[in-house]
C-alpha cells in the first residue's frame, strides 16, 4: 500500500505548502531566533539572516520536516508506524515527535554510527536497526523493511 504523503520529486514547493506546514507546526516546535550574518552577507553581497534551529529540542532543524510529515499521516499510517534511515539528527527528531504522537518508529542506522547517536535515538523511543557499512546500505535496508512491515517511510531530506 503506497503512503498517502509520499513526495513527488517533480513538484516544486509552493508558498501555499509552506504556509500550510507553518500552520501545522505552530505551537509544536520552538520559534527560534534569526540573526544577521555579516560574514555571509559580505560573501554574497546580499543581506543574509540565519535561523538558529539548533535551539530546537533535539538541537537540529530536522524537527520541522519530521513533525510536518508525521502530522500529515492518516490514522491508519500512524498505527502502522514509520521508518527512516538516518545516522543522527533526522533519527532523533523523528523519534522524539513520533513518540509524542504515539507513532511506532523504526530507525535504520549504519553499523558505524556513533553509539551516542544510537542511544540518544533509542532513548527517544525508536527501535534501532544497525545495518550496512554506509548510509546508502542503511537506506536500502530501510526501504526493504518498509515493504516487509508495511511501514511509512519518512525521508531524511525530501
Where do the protein language model's features map onto the residues?
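PLP-dependent amino-acid enzyme catalytic core
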Residues: 1-158
Amino acid at each position: 500500500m503506497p503512503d498517502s504523503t509520499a513526495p513527488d520529486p517533480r513538484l516544486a514547493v509552493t508558498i501555499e505548502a509552506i504556509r500550510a506546514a507553518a500552520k501545522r507546526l505552530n505551537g509544536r516546535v520552538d520559534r527560534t531566533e534569526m540573526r544577521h550574518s555579516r560574514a555571509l552577507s559580505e560573501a554574497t553581497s546580499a543581506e543574509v539572516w540565519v535561523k538558529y534551529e539548533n535551539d530546537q529540542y533535539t538541537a537540529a532543524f530536522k524537527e520541522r520536516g519530521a513533525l510536518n510529515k508525521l502530522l500529515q499521516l492518516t490514522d491508519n499510517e500512524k498505527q502502522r508506524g514509520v521508518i527512516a534511515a538516518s545516522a543522527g539528527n533526522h533519527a532523533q527528531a523523528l523519534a522524539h515527535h513520533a513518540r509524542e504522537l504515539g507513532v511506532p518508529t523504526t530507525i535504520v542506522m549504519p553499523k558505524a554510527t556513533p553509539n551516542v547517536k544510537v542511544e540518544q535515538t533509542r532513548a527517544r523511543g525508536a527501535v534501532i536497526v544497525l545495518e550496512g557499512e554506509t548510509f546508502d546500505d542503511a537506506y536500502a535496508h530501510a526501504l526493504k523493511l518498509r515493504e516487509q512491515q508495511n511501514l511509512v517511510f519518512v525521508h531524511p531530506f525530501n
